[in-house]
Design a protein with these regions (language model features):
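S-adenosyl-L-methionine
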Residues: 20-95
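Short catalytic/ligand-binding loop motif for oxyanion handling, primarily in non-cytosolic enzymes
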Residues: 17, 52-54, 108-110, 141-145
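A short glycine-rich, Lys/Arg-flanked "PGG" loop and its adjoining helix->strand segment in the class I
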Residues: 90-96, 107, 113-132
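SAM-dependent methyltransferase
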Residues: 136, 140-179
Length: 179
């Protein structure tokens, strides 16, 4: 918001992270937009950034594919078919975005060489030449130390009311952290 972005395209693997009516990205965005007229326009789609985004392989719904195509200037530029919000962003990503980011999810792509390679390909295909990629990840040493007294299979977690909102499961038996 303070960076004065004009548009945000969000892609999340977990559909609930986008569409949950209470605290999904869409609900939070709409609530913030009511309060702040400086909020950038935003579109959110359900997908997997370890699969190709621009060719829609990584996009899970037909509506999401239509959104991605429109943002990258592919297909018919028709407000009636696309809807006002999507139509407004038609072609915004044709040359890539000034900023692409991955917040606290980059570790998922290291499941395999193929996934990390495709993720990096997405970054290069969707970031404008001269643009920036911003990634955040957890501090491995801090998490290792937090999990030190946990047995394999036990976890750290945070609840909000009665809903688990965060959990990390210890899936290793190493006793020393090797960076």
């Amino acid at each position: 918001i303070q960076a004065k972005l004009s548009f945000v395209l969000g892609i999340d693997y977990a559909n609930d992270n986008i569409h949950n009516r209470i605290d999904g990205a869409c609900a939070r965005y709409l609530n913030m937009r009511k309060k702040m007229n400086t909020m950038p326009y935003a579109l959110f789609v359900h997908g997997d950034s370890s699969e190709n985004i621009k060719d829609n392989t990584g996009i899970y719904t037909e509506r999401g594919k239509s959104v991605i195509n429109s943002v990258f200037g592919i297909g018919e530029q028709n407000e009636e078919k696309l809807g006002k919000g999507v139509f407004r962003q038609y072609g915004k990503g044709v040359d890539g975005f000034n900023i692409c980011s991955c917040q606290f999810a980059i570790h998922y792509f290291f499941e395999s060489k193929n996934k990390v390679h495709q993720f990096l390909k997405n970054v290069t295909e969707t970031t404008k030449v001269g643009g920036y990629f911003i990634g955040t990840s957890y501090d491995g040493l801090t998490l290792f130390n937090e999990l030190r007294n946990k047995k394999q299979g036990e976890s750290l977690y945070i609840y909000k009311n009665d809903n688990k909102i965060w959990e990390i499961v210890k899936q290793y038996s190493h006793e020393e952290f090797k960076s």
